[in-house]
């Protein structure tokens, strides 16, 4: 099954690589239109996934990731149209020149080929990844979690029908809809056809891919994100940043998980924060000093464990740690962070610069919410993933991250001396 799927994807990728930008945009436009026209059918299938998720006792955070609404579906269609508006990186000359030998040489962006994406309870990823891959001339094999089987099946049908309407091979976008985990293992070994594996999910999924894949893997997505409130920060403004970073959409990987507060302002700042977040149902997990302050402020708080400091909650749980100074904050991030998104709230330019220089993360923020780590927010369009590694791509992966390059060399029957 997967051998055939891989061959079909490879053949489709050859065709996609030859397409003009206009041809790719035409296909994307039809996909966006079909998402809107088929919305009742898509939402009906998604409702089946939601019902099964509730029956199986999945968490509210997972169900939120799984849920499609009319508004979210319209947002997905709009994201596809935004990808249309983005510059096509394929064929772009990165650099070049003429050598002493007279050989003209250029480095030109090209598609990667076939992308394999493994993800969990996020049906929106199906369209996000498909649209980015199509724009960059890549074929894609998608494997969503068993929680999304009904949603993914109908979304793939919509996309494949749109591709055929555009005169393109429907096998440019394929999905493994069988929930058998053995098929994931087979996909990870399909290096004859697949050029890159992009996992989107928890740490367990990323470890599985790293350990078993014979194909290059993009590692990332797990976000134990920190925000450090330094003593010179504007406390009233800082509270709103923390509120946004923690409560706007807790299930995302760019959500704040651990709040670090400088010791000298903790007794003043933390009660203000608790009061502000009182209606948000935030549950705090704190150490020693922070634990006592939060208890006195009437917060719903318990003692944090070492394991929880490394945990991506994906919920309204928030770790709180009081640190002595910026050095202690940076050391805590070094020990517990996942190199995703880290933020400092401060009025000191020198401390902000120190934080930027010393914190190793895909995205580092000064006086801003970590929630901005997103392809759309960064102006990249829908993202295929957020990479926390350093090779090939880092941070939100938009169009350019789905390309490679080739050296194009032109001569006048030139030979090397």
Curated annotation (Swiss-Prot):
Gene Ontology biological process terms from the UniProt entry: L-proline biosynthetic process
Q: Where is the signal peptide?
A: none
Show the disulfide pairing. Answer: none
Please tell me which top-level EC class this enzyme sits in: oxidoreductase
Q: Which Pfam families match?
A: Aldedh (PF00171)
Keywords in alphabetical order, please. Answer: Amino-acid biosynthesis, Cytoplasm, NADP, Oxidoreductase, Proline biosynthesis
Instruction: Kindly indicate whether the keyword Phosphoprotein belongs to this entry.
Output: no
Give the metabolic or biological pathway: Amino-acid biosynthesis; L-proline biosynthesis; L-glutamate 5-semialdehyde from L-glutamate: step 2/2
Q: Which reaction does it catalyse?
A: L-glutamate 5-semialdehyde + phosphate + NADP(+) = L-glutamyl 5-phosphate + NADPH + H(+)
**Which locations, inside or outside the cell, does it occupy?**
Cytoplasm
The entry lists its GO molecular-function terms as: glutamate-5-semialdehyde dehydrogenase activity; NADP binding
| GO terms under cellular component | cytoplasm
InterPro entries named among the record's database cross-references: Ald_DH/histidinol_DH (IPR016161), Ald_DH_C (IPR016163), Ald_DH_N (IPR016162), Aldehyde_DH_dom (IPR015590), G-glutamylP_reductase_CS (IPR020593), Glu-5-SA_DH (IPR012134), GPR_dom (IPR000965)
Gene3D superfamilies associated with the record:
Aldehyde Dehydrogenase, Chain A, domain 1 (3.40.605.10), Aldehyde Dehydrogenase, Chain A, domain 2 (3.40.309.10)
Xref: HAMAP family: ProA
Q: Which family does it belong to?
A: Belongs to the gamma-glutamyl phosphate reductase family.
Q: What is this protein called?
A: Gamma-glutamyl phosphate reductase
Q: What is the lineage of its organism?
A: Bacteria, Pseudomonadati, Pseudomonadota, Gammaproteobacteria, Pasteurellales
